[in-house]
């Protein structure tokens, strides 16, 4: 079954102005509808490097939901555990300014609790065949508890990613059960209630090493955009991964 990824599917609705963006005025531009969601993006990226992952999620019972599943299947993602339920997908509405920077956004989260029912019914089947597991840590608490329990039962590595850090900070107690937690520089600042915006990779690496020790978090990776990423774990291992050239799409 390969890597199993748990999380929400979002539809990203993005607005781009044709001219200078006026926050309190009308702006002419264009709107794009994009399949999104952190876990959906992650599972597609994993599939793109030929690792044949499995996705556990929910989509709407609509043409758009069918299109999400069709695209994932085209990328060789196993969607056998993607449920089809009315209102199953979330929505992210975002407006960008004339420089391409995010000017504002609103997120509507889906109801993911049907995944808990799926885990009660087929959890052992899913985890027994998994190589490792990735889950959005800001999913419903009961779902995270079940994922953690099944990971321990079947001795599977558990990795956490984040969609909404405001919710994820309430899951601190769970992170000690994860093999690794991955977030970006801004999210790390929110998580540890500090400002890391101007920190260099060298500085953040040292800070992260201290923070994972104090928080008893087994390991963390913090991405830093064009500065690469830093990592640290409870064994004292830490370091910096330099950036690689990529084509930025979004």
Where are these regions (language model features)?
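Conserved phosphate-binding/catalytic region of the ribokinase-like
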Residues: 3-4, 27, 199-250
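Conserved beta-alpha-beta core of the PfkB/ribokinase-like small-molecule kinase fold
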Residues: 132-206, 227-229
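Structural alpha-helical scaffold elements that stabilize or flank donor/cofactor-binding regions
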Residues: 125-126, 173-174, 213
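Short beta-strand scaffold segments in enzyme catalytic cores
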Residues: 91-95, 104, 228-232
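Glycine-rich phosphate/adenosyl-contacting loop at the front of the ribokinase-like
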Residues: 1-58, 63-70, 74, 92, ...
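Conserved phosphate-binding/catalytic loop of the ribokinase/pfkB sugar-kinase fold
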Residues: 84, 94-132, 137
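A glycine-rich helix N-cap at a beta->alpha junction
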Residues: 71-86
